[in-house]
């Protein structure tokens, strides 16, 4: 389901995965096999979920890597759409004409 203004996926990691377990960022980073700085950047919205991180999150907290990457994609698209007036494009063709 697409959200108009989705939260940064790092916020979801913090609020829905790390905090309910009573983990510190350092403890969660150790369990995920990443540096404290890498996880801190993610949960504070300074970094996104990479394919590798999506696998780590999937193994640690469940769900699938695709779900984690989907959250990241929705967030990234929503951020890009906030500046669509800055994106200048001339239409080339419609999708159905290209896919044939």
Residue ranges: model-predicted function:
Residues 22-41:
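Short alpha-helical DNA-recognition segment
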Residues 1-23, 70:
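A short, Lys/Arg-rich alpha-helix, primarily the initiator
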Residues 69-100:
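Short, charged recognition helix plus adjacent turn
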Residues 9, 64-65:
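Hydrophobic side chains within well-formed alpha-helices
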Residues 41, 55, 70:
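DNA-binding alpha-helical recognition surfaces that contact promoter or target DNA
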Residues 35, 46, 61, 72-75:
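The DNA-recognition helices of helix-turn-helix-type DNA-binding domains
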Residues 46-59:
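Short, basic-rich loop-to-helix N-cap that marks the start of a DNA-contacting helix
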């Amino acid at each position: 389901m697409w959200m108009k203004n989705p939260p940064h996926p790092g916020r979801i990691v913090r609020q829905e995965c790390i905090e309910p377990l009573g983990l510190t960022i350092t403890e969660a980073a150790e369990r995920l096999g990443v540096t404290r700085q890498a996880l801190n950047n993610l949960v504070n919205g300074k970094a996104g979920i990479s394919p590798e991180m999506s696998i780590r999150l999937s193994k640690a907290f469940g769900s699938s890597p695709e779900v984690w990457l989907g959250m990241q994609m929705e967030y990234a698209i929503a951020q890009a759409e906030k500046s669509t007036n800055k994106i200048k494009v001339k239409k080339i063709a419609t999708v159905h004409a290209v896919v044939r």
